[in-house]
Curated annotation (Swiss-Prot):
Main localization category: cytoplasm
Name assigned to this protein: Holliday junction branch migration complex subunit RuvA
Function in brief: The RuvA-RuvB-RuvC complex processes Holliday junction (HJ) DNA during genetic recombination and DNA repair, while the RuvA-RuvB complex plays an important role in the rescue of blocked DNA replication forks via replication fork reversal (RFR). RuvA specifically binds to HJ cruciform DNA, conferring on it an open structure. The RuvB hexamer acts as an ATP-dependent pump, pulling dsDNA into and through the RuvAB complex. HJ branch migration allows RuvC to scan DNA until it finds its consensus sequence, where it cleaves and resolves the cruciform DNA.
Cell location: Cytoplasm
GO MF terms, alphabetically ordered: ATP binding; four-way junction DNA binding; four-way junction helicase activity
GO biological process, one term: DNA repair
Record keywords: Cytoplasm, DNA damage, DNA recombination, DNA repair, DNA-binding
Length: 205
């Protein structure tokens, strides 16, 4: 099992990165809430990973710390939650926000996440409340909404950023029209892909 990778960030294509470790490039899928805190391409990064083996693929899911990975693993234990839905849930809200929703029995907020209907939201609260009751705020490093993300300066690149943002949202489970509408509603000149995704996700919650 691959539990941790320490290498150079070669590519960032939300929600996937390519991390080069000792000459080997690892494709790692990450929740967008983790993606925002990644360093720039070309810099070193440490990612805690969860390794999934399927008949048709071997997949790596990455997180910035062990707490986020632990929550992802708890999600996978819930009935009807696979890696793709777990990734979508933790892209739509931070680990701390999800734990708060479960502990407060706030299924209404969970329903706004892609792939989570009313029954799934209620089941998540029911199944996970006991498992997460001891997860206090001291476990989390608060995510800063003011985190600096480099903007694009070229209009053509900005258009590509919008397309990439839509593609990322679709890969997280949102319908194409919904993703396009969200990106269009928040799009401003010189916005990077990460900023577009972040603001689009916020607009849908």
């Amino acid at each position: 099992m691959i539990g941790r990778l320490n290498g150079i960030l070669v590519e960032k294509q939300p929600p996937e990165i390519l991390l080069e470790v000792s000459g080997v490039g690892y494709e790692v899928q990450m929740p967008m809430t983790c993606f925002y805190d990644l360093p720039k391409v070309g810099e070193s990064a440490i990612v805690y990973t969860h390794f999934v083996v399927r008949e048709d693929a071997q997949l790596l899911f990455g997180f910035n710390n062990k707490v986020e990975r632990a929550l992802f693993r708890e999600l996978l234990k819930a009935n009807g939650v696979g890696p793709k839905l777990g990734l979508a849930i933790l892209s739509g809200m931070s680990a701390q926000q999800f734990v708060s929703c479960v502990n407060n029995e706030d299924s209404t907020s969970l329903v706004k996440l892609p792939g989570v209907g009313k029954k799934t939201a209620e089941r998540l609260v029911l199944e996970m409340k006991d498992r997460l009751k001891n997860w206090g705020n001291d476990l989390f490093t608060p995510f800063s909404d003011s985190a600096v993300i480099e903007p694009f300066s070229d209009a053509t690149i900005a258009n590509n950023a919008a397309d990439d943002a839509v593609s990322a949202l679709v890969s997280l489970g949102y319908k194409l029209p919904q993703a396009q509408k969200a990106v269009k509603s928040v799009s401003k000149p010189d916005m990077s892909t990460e900023v577009l995704i972040k603001e689009s996700l916020k607009s849908m919650l």
